[in-house]
């Protein structure tokens, strides 16, 4: 028994303490809290840019439709003619609703 106790006293195991592990977890959680809001802002910015691109596509398709058919284009007419999809029409409406719709060129 004495040999076992002396052996355990002599054998020093290198390991992290509980306090060190808690500090590491604290640092990781603080970094996580700093980066997550930035990721959501980036996602919103990408979505807005994508919808702005869809607006340009819809407006250019409306202009082409007006030139070919000699009548004003609407979202319904563009969809019926197969020039835009339902998702593009929805994105066009959402973008204009969000930005006030003052510069809207294509009506429903």
Swiss-Prot record:
Membrane topology classification: Single-pass membrane protein
Bilayer-spanning residue ranges: 16-36
Pfam families in UniProt: N_methyl
Region spans: May be involved in polymerization of ComGC: 14-39
Taxonomy, superkingdom: Bacteria
Keyword Cell membrane among record annotations: yes
Subunit annotation: The transformation pili are flexible filaments, consisting mainly of the major pilin ComGC and smaller amounts of the minor pilins, including at least ComGD, ComGF and ComGG, and perhaps ComGE. Homodimer. Forms higher-order multimers. Interacts with ComGG; the interaction is probably direct.
Family: Belongs to the ComGC family.
UniProt protein name: Competence protein ComGC
Originating gene: comGC
């Amino acid at each position: 028994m004495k040999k076992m106790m002396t052996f355990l006293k002599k054998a020093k195991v290198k390991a992290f303490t509980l306090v060190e592990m808690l500090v590491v977890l604290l640092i990781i959680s603080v970094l996580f809290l700093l980066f997550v809001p930035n990721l959501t802002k980036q996602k919103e910015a990408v979505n807005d840019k994508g919808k702005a691109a869809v607006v340009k596509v819809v407006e250019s398709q409306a202009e082409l439709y007006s030139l070919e058919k000699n009548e004003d284009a609407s979202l319904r007419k563009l969809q019926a003619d197969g020039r835009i999809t339902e998702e593009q029409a929805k994105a066009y409406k959402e973008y204009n609703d969000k930005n006030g719709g003052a510069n809207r060129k294509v009506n429903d």
